[in-house]
Structure formats: C-alpha cells, structure tokens
Amino acid sequence: MNILLIGIDNAGLITPIVEEMRQQGHAVTFIENGEISRYDYLHPVERISNLISKALFKRNLKQERSWLSTTQFLNGFTKNRHFDITILTNPDIYTAEHLTQIKKCTNRMICHLWDSTLRMPNNIKNISLFDKVLSFDPQDVKKYGFTPVTNYYKNNLTPLQPNRNYDGDVFGIFSFDRERYAFITAFLDANPDLKIKIMIYVDHQRKIKKIRDERVEIITKPITGDELLAISSAYHCILDIGYQSQKGLSFRFFESLAYEQKIISNNNTAETYPFFHPNNIFCITDEDLKVSPDFLAIPYHHISDEIKNQYRLDIWVNKYIKAML
C-alpha cells in the first residue's frame, strides 16, 4: 500500500514504524508536522505585534500565518498525489480546512491518538472528518468507540541476563512535569529502604529551579538507546509514572516486557492486559506508594512468546495496518 504518515517523531517512536512498514513492502511517505505548519518570527517587532494583537483584538497573528503556511504547503503537496491510507497523530494542529484538503488525496484518513482526549481535548475537535480513529487509551475507546491500539517494542529487544550485576532496585527517567515530579518525591519518601535512581530531563533553565529534591538527578540532554539501556539494565525494576488524565500504557511496559524486567507503575490498567503477572508488574496509587519487599525478592515470571510477540514491532505493524482498513 501507499501510506502517508504525518506526525511528530521527537522521541523516535514513529521512525521504527515507518521503517517496518517499508520492510513489509509498503511505500511510506513520512512528514514531520514542523515541515508543514511552522512559522517563525522574522523580526522581534513581529513578536511584539502579535502580543498586542492577542491582548487587544483576540487575534493570534502567528497562528494565522502558520495556518496560511500550512494551507500553501498542503495545496502543493496534495496536487497529483494519492495515498491508500493517511495517518495523522496530532490532528489538533490542523484546521478542518487542512484536514479536508489532506482527505482529498487519500482513500482513508486515519487518526492515531497517542494521548488521551482528557489530556489533549483539541485532538477531537474535527474527529468526524476521519474514517477511523485509533487510540491507546482504554477510556477513550470505551467512551467514543475508537479502535484500540497499544504501543510496541522494537524487534531487536531481547531479554536481559537475569544474573547481571545490579546497581540498585528501581530506575526511572522522565521529562519534567509538575504533577509527575510531585509523585516522584512522594514515591521516594514512601520507599526509603529502596535504592532508587531518578533522572529528570529538563529543556529550560526555569524548570531546573523547580527541582529541589537532591535525590533527583537533573539531565539537560535526552538519554536514549544503548546509553539508556546501559543504565536501566543495572536495576531490578523500571518506574513508570503516567498522567492521571490518561490510562493507556506507556512504551515502558512493552520494553520491560521485551527485556523481561520488572516494572512499578501508577497505571493499574496494566492489570487488564494479557501479559500482566503480579510477579512482574506492581501497581501503586496516590494513597499507597509503598512497594512490597516481596515484589523485589520473587523471580520474574516468564510470559509466553505467544502473548509477548503480539507487541513486537513486525507483528504489531501488520495488525496496525489491518486495524485501519
């Protein structure tokens, strides 16, 4: 099939999907949102003018110019092109007119929501324009009738050696968020006997000032791939802290499944998935953040390949495409 995918690949999560689709014989065009809908101020005066316009006339001139730039790009891009499927992951940044223009060059236009509608409500303002909506959030699937889709793990991930050397009990790495940071400090307070390593990535100096807990390590550059694995694999458990406004499982669950590494999470939706086992996944709540010592002591319970492989990227992509038809 001829597939167009429009989205953001900040965390490098879309590129593996594109590569696997191509590996399976599909022709895939991937466009970053920033290539379509980007407008930068040409002069400081423009920024000031926009601030005045928003304050006095409720008009966002930068947004209007960005929308115009998007319209011009789409008019040129969609001309003489046609796709079997077009997938958008961030519909909130496009107007109804933009989506209608995209729809003219495709047989089926699909929305794939990587965030819940509670967290990103603008994602569904033009949802009726899509032929199908896929969502990782079970609450949205139930409420709106969206098609469920999980996250995945990459094909090359294999179980960690169970007899490897350990530096500690729990490892967690996160981008800064006030809600998440408060939960992290509470978790640390509740588990003083555990050896826990927490790293928080910040992309602005003002955020650094908000992290005052000395138990938290601040990083200013993202850590990914083999560098991250070298750190995380030295701990018995991975810490996952999701937003209260969404219940879909993060990529940490699926990577932990591939690595056969235990995970601690505040997302109790994990208990409803076929790969759940109490030896491997420990759920905490706002009211009870204490991790049972037994959870760390008992061995990892092997999950059958039949269940585990459902989330491996090659099999996942095959199911993903079928779900859009």
Where in this protein do the model-derived segments appear?
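Surface-exposed amphipathic alpha-helices with a cationic face
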Residues: L99-T106, L188
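A short helix->loop->beta-strand "cap" motif at the edges of active sites that frequently abuts
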Residues: C105-R108, D131, Y259-Q261
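Pol beta-like nucleotidyltransferase catalytic core
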Residues: A258, K262-L325
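Nucleotide-sugar donor-binding catalytic core of glycosyltransferases
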Residues: M1-F73, N80, N90-E97, W114-S250, ...
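Short acidic/histidine-rich motifs immediately flanking catalytic phosphotransfer sites
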Residues: R81-I85
